Amino acid sequence: MTAERNLRKTRVGVVTSDKMDKTVVVAVETLVQHPLYKKRVRRTKKFKAHDEHNQCKVGDKVRIMETRPLSKEKRWRVVEIIESAPDYKSAPEV
């Protein structure tokens, strides 16, 4: 079973929405080359990912992995939180 999971696609992106229960929206940026002008252009694609424990918050950098369909649009799950977003609510005011 471990060898099978290594074949699954993984992506790294930033959480843009955590308003749903056990679901986050992750924006994944990729660089693609323009076919005519050869300039590298940034493309963003959003994935809905399963967050079992509701740990992710907006701004977190996360790794997601492909999984079986969990709902109509959800085919990814959060594997780990790479970098946590800064918490501005607890910062002291000037």
UniProtKB/Swiss-Prot annotation:
Keywords: Ribonucleoprotein, Ribosomal protein, RNA-binding, rRNA-binding. InterPro entries: NA-bd_OB-fold, Ribosomal_uS17, Ribosomal_uS17_bact/chlr, Ribosomal_uS17_CS. One of its GO terms (biological process) is translation. The keyword Repressor does not apply. The keyword rRNA-binding applies. One of its GO terms (molecular function) is rRNA binding. GO terms for cellular component: cytosolic small ribosomal subunit. It holds the Pfam family Ribosomal_S17. NCBIfam families: PRK05610.1, uS17_bact. Part of the 30S ribosomal subunit. Belongs to the universal ribosomal protein uS17 family. One of the primary rRNA binding proteins, it binds specifically to the 5'-end of 16S ribosomal RNA. This is Small ribosomal subunit protein uS17. It comes from Symbiobacterium thermophilum (strain DSM 24528 / JCM 14929 / IAM 14863 / T). The gene is rpsQ.
